[in-house]
Amino acid sequence: MKSDKKKIYLFIAVVVIVGILTTLSSFALWTVASNNINVAVNTFPPLEGNIRYTEGHSILAGDLPLCLNYFDGINTTFTIGKESNLSEHLVYASMHLKTNDDSYLAYADAINWQIRTASSASPLASGTLADFAVGSNIMLDNIEVTTTDTSYTFYIWVDSTYGDANALAGLTIDLELWMEVRYERYNVRPVVNEGLIPVVFDTTSGTVVKTIGKNDGDWYNYDKQKWANAVLVTESSRSTYLNTSGVTVSESDILGYFVWIPRYRYKIWTTGVSSSGNEQEIDIIFEGKNETKAVATQAGGYYTHPAFTFGGTQLDGFWIGKFETSGPASLPKVKPDIKALVSQNISTQFATALKFAGGTQSGSTVTFDGNSTYGLTSKTDSHMLKNSEWGAVAYLSHSKYGANREVYINNSSGLYTGRSGGNVSGSTPINGTYTDQTSTTQYNSYGFYTWDGYLLNYNTNTRSSTRNLNKVASTTGNIYGVYDMSGGAYEYVMGNFANTIGNSGFTTLPDSKYYDVYSSDVFTGTSTTNINFCTLATCGGHALNETAGWYSDSSRFVYSSSAWFRRGGYYNGSASGIFYFYYDSGTNVANFSFRTCLSDA
């Protein structure tokens, strides 16, 4: 059919909005008037007045011919740049599209869109409306805003090769197109719960833990794999460290180390089951809890990680224990160089994690009264790590903000926290590190390296003078990451099949926000086949199907007889790793530990 013989009439309502969302608790809205009806530029500090923006037309209406090429479609162009005083800061703009009616659904695969710049030989992003559900917000593209103004044009048209063109005559489509602009540093700003003390590590001579102000720019830099760290200290020493900077924190005063995992969206690379050999850098964009959630459903779109939705609360991030939880159970800690707390069933592990913030469980209800021992108040929720929260850390680790490779293994058979074999699982023979030894065994009681990179004297718990910080087994490959996520003890997480209590010890499962559930209505197979039923809605971000088999880590799903997930693998397993997952019953086992997480209550 020739395009001049048949025209399709589309009404496209395109609302272009620029919104800058940060983790600041309060802000004033700044609106720039537009020459075009219904177009405004909305922003918040610190970008107020520092973003240059020229709007496209708010209303596009007209005859849209059937065509083969984008340039015959209808379009809108907008231009964006930043002022020179932001030249040292990363600013990103994401383009979003939302459909407001369902009239197009039967023909969605015929309606094409593209985003281009004047200089681009190929589109920056493209697709069809088949990727959209009514009312869903789809991120079309994410671009860095530079000091050079750049124009972007959005095109939409009907494919002339579509078989049933007559059915499209007179079709009206209501779409919204807008932008969100983010100042990256503000989107990773940690929420410092009362009792937490921001720290950095001075490794110039030994390892010295020092306090730092929460607004100090040297506290963290995720662009350089320097994740924000904080500690909990004893009640008697707390006043020495609170609200200080540069004060050395005595190791004996520290009760727990925690690492901030900031809220983000990630780019979907598969909706199926991955496998070994398909490892790739995970594309992550930090976001604030007040930003519109990304809810793409297809590869190439962005999806807000589910770990940052805690029940009905949107989180800017959470604090994860830097190490596996250690004992005693009556006074749990999160520290290096201590044996992990093991031999607890899942219900006891859950109750132990609650102790940090004075939590108790009654029936399914969990309440917090605070705990002066750790300095946490009732405004903090301390809980056992969920499966999705494990996934959030794993994905951040495998992005440009983390090690972006296989995490080294903790090869301590004594289950000492923070230890390292100096390499990945299956690649840590004793004679490869200790050249005066002949054994090819992959582990020993204490591991080979400490959390701060010191080589241990062979098969002892004493440090040598040899140090290599590149040998540490953290999610960043340096001292600022999370440890013990490959090897060490197995770690139970709160991930459960069909609300099955099993051998966990629970009488009643806690509130559903404390665990991820994998429904028997969906997962109807076995430990080896259930992964095939994963979808973005059920498993997205959990480091299950999306990363299955990465680095040959074991992949076995929960099912009716073994209803609880364990993660990370064991000190001696070649299939251990941050993407390892396996089923278990939830019972107490002598080599199973767990992880503690802190978030807003």
Residue ranges and their predicted role:
Residues S388-G391, S412-Y446, W451-D452, L456-T462, ...:
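C-terminal, surface-exposed recognition/capping segments
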Residues T325-A351, N503-N532:
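A solvent-exposed, charged loop/short amphipathic helix patch at secondary-structure junctions
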Residues T248, S252-L255, E287-M485, D600:
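Short aromatic-cysteine micro-motif
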Residues K2-K6, A61-Y70, A121-S151, Y155-D159:
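Extracellular adhesion/glycan-binding regions together with long Ser/Thr-
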Residues D72-V91, H96, M139-Y186:
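C-terminal, structured domain-capping segment
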Residues T22, T31, L68-S126:
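Surface-exposed interaction patch
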Residues K2-N69, A169-L175, E180-Y186:
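Short, polar/proline-rich extracytoplasmic segments that appear immediately after membrane translocation
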Residues N187-G301:
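N-terminal module-boundary/linker segments of secreted carbohydrate-active enzymes
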